[in-house]
A protein has these predicted regions:
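C-terminal lobe helix-coil module of Hanks-type protein kinase domains
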Residues: 1-48
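Amphipathic alpha-helical protein-interaction segments enriched in hydrophobic
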Residues: 419-424, 453-464, 488
Length: 515
């Protein structure tokens, strides 16, 4: 049987999804079942507004990755770079709320209705565009769309030589300011798109570095660093490239891929050089903050650097979420909530932002809320390693032991058995009473340590789970000597609660200058 349902009884948002499924042009339909599921989830979560009233989101914008229309399809890094440069430029405007890169780029190569994208990103307008290259000529199109009704506000086509890319970006940013009626601050007389180099090849190398840095895995970081170094060879005064190198080394050091001292000494040199060249570069201040936080244990300077970065760019979601992480380590949990919400407003679909929010809430012992944040991250990316690596600790606190083991096993597999994922897995096995399996993980890490760096904290985690506290304290002592970043967790981490009554733990705490 069939039923005729009056159109006015079908929610407007669901009608839009159906129309999208029935588009005559296949390219305009949902390209995968996952894309359709995203649309339906948005309705389920109430992210579509049922009322017909206009949302008060103005002025706000999400810049989507530009589409590579070149026959060779070899400009993905360049298309991403244009969008990212525009995000950076627009983020400097005080009167405009700008969705961060990670969330905007979740819609890369997805044929979704801009109204749905606007709802998911909480953005009143969308900027999208395309790039076609022929020889030394570029054709760049850009279109600004109102997400409440899908209508075009502005569009333009630029046919230029490739060396004019900075001028094109400036023109696009200026058109957005004009069309969204953004009032520039008094005395704001500088270009919206800051030009850090006149060397076009250095600029391309930097964009390639950003492309690989965004992947955030060890091989990608190595490639990113190589491109940044090549950019610096061409232009030794290219400040963002130095900031990029600092970012890479802080990640490599924090993930345990490099010895802490090696990583943070190199990160410090790069961050200081970036700030020497341009003290207004927000990402360089964030890198400096992380070095002061994770390695120097200079909490006052770390906080000053975080706050300076946010003064320079209030739309910097990584700065907000790393500042939240810092505040959680300091036990300042009411302030943590403010920074988490600021980061999530700017970057609602970022798996990293939501995972770090989960970590901060775990430190606050808000386990139900932490679990929700990790699950939000995994809803977007089911294989997101940071979420999988930490959600197990929350499951343990909630006595969800099967889930804890399953998450840890996935993290080990997806990370190609990285040291930290193995340590987390080993500690969970130990807590579950699987001592023999936990011992085999220790043996694997010991064999690895003969050829490459394995942070001492990895061994400490497993011995804590086994209640072998003498060995755990020996490895914690080594971790303190090496300044493993996990030492910053000593004061607040629930995973260390079993040690807190031990005089050795209190003595260890006194050697770290916690406030």
């Amino acid at each position: 049987d069939t039923f005729d349902i009056p159109a006015d009884l079908i929610p407007r948002q669901f009608q839009q999804v159906i129309r999208h499924c029935l588009e005559k042009n296949p390219q305009k339909r949902y390209q995968t079942a996952h894309d359709l599921a995203l649309a339906l989830k948005a309705i389920e979560r109430g992210q579509w507004q049922v009322s017909s009233g206009t949302r008060k989101l103005w002025p706000s914008i999400a810049v989507l990755p530009f589409i590579d229309m070149s026959p060779e399809k070899d400009l993905e890094y360049f298309c991403d770079g244009i969008a990212e440069e525009l995000i950076h430029a627009l983020s400097r405007l005080r009167g405009l709320y700008v969705t961060s890169r990670t969330s905007a780029f979740q819609f890369k190569q997805k044929a979704l209705d801009v109204r749905l994208i606007g709802q998911q990103l909480n953005a009143a307008t969308i900027l999208e565009g395309s790039v076609r290259k022929s020889g030394t000529r570029l054709r760049i199109t850009a279109e600004l769309i109102n997400t409440s009704d899908g209508y075009q506000i502005w569009s333009e086509r630029y046919d230029r030589e490739i060396q004019d890319i900075f001028l094109v970006q400036e023109n696009i940013a200026g058109a957005i300011v004009e069309n969204l009626k953004i009032k520039l601050a008094a005395g704001f007389d500088q270009p919206l798109v800051k030009r850090y180099t006149e060397d076009l090849e250095a600029y391309h190398l930097y964009l390639k570095g950003r492309y690989f840095w965004a992947k955030r895995y060890e091989a990608g970081l190595s490639k990113a660093m190589d491109f940044y170094l090549q950019a610096i060879e061409r232009d030794p005064e290219y400040a963002p490239a130095y900031a990029g190198i600092a970012d890479c080394y802080t990640i490599l050091g924090s993930y345990g891929f490099l010895h802490t001292k090696t990583a943070f000494d190199k990160a410090r040199a790069a961050a200081e050089k970036a700030l020497e060249l341009d003290e207004t570069l927000p990402e360089a201040h964030v890198a400096a903050a992380l070095i002061s936080f994770w390695y120097d244990w200079n909490w006052e300077l770390a906080e000053q650097s975080f706050q300076h970065a946010l003064q320079l760019n209030p739309n910097d979601s990584p700065a907000h979420i790393w500042y939240a992480t810092f505040l959680s380590m300091m036990g300042r949990f009411p302030e943590v909530e403010v920074e988490i919400r600021s980061a999530q407003k700017l970057d609602p679909l970022s798996p990293l932002v939501n995972s770090l929010a989960g970590c901060a809430l775990y430190m606050a012992r808000a386990y139900d809320e932490a679990l929700l944040e990790f699950q939000k991250a995994l809803d977007v990316d089911t294989d997101f390693l940071v979420a999988l690596s930490f959600i197990g600790s929350v499951y343990i606190e909630k006595s969800m032991f099967n889930e804890a083991r399953a998450a840890a096993e996935r993290a080990v597999k997806l990370s190609s058995r990285s040291s930290f994922s193995l340590a987390s897995y080993g500690s969970i096995l130990a807590v579950l009473g699987h001592t023999e399996e936990a011992q085999s993980v220790i043996a694997e890490l010991q064999n690895r340590s003969k050829e490459q760096y394995v942070p001492a904290f990895c061994f400490a985690m497993i011995h804590i789970g086994m209640k072998d506290y003498d060995r755990a304290f020996a490895f914690l002592e080594e971790s303190l000597q090496d300044r493993n970043i996990q030492i910053c967790f000593l004061k607040e981490s629930p995973g260390l609660d079993s040690l807190r009554s031990d005089p050795r733990f209190r003595a260890l705490l006194h050697r770290v200058p916690f406030p």
